[in-house]
């Protein structure tokens, strides 16, 4: 079990994704300063975790937060006018929120967490599923005019779905919390197909052909 400073947000950070933040609230300004202080040898990593629907940003406690979040490596920080900062971070590994560390003594929330591994699931299926998801995303982008800069690594592909398809927090959280790569790819395919059907029903897209395929 490790400890990690948390930045609760109304969004979900995916591994490999960039997250720009404008920081002005005093407790998170302090978090940023602590990360930049460099008094220990650890990388400047904090945890981004989504707030559950019905709770506010200021609500404390595990109940207000989703159980799975993503580490965020601070890659850039710049001071703005006043006590404001612009920071850019990049998603690293997923973690499970075990408990709030009440003894941390920090103005921001510090948590006890467990870093999560990335199991593959059914390895033979992954290549097929990744090819299908890549085709679905490419067709969706072509039909809607969205950008689709897709990672080449199969394991990372499902994490990139929100970059092309607009998903709400609940769906993003389901992708992040999927137990393995296989199940995440399957979920990604279902989500892209659903959004394409929504867009078709609204008359917003044409029909870029996709070869027949079964998830079974």
Pin down the residues of each PLM region.
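N-terminal low-complexity, acidic/polar interaction/targeting segments
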Residues: 1-216
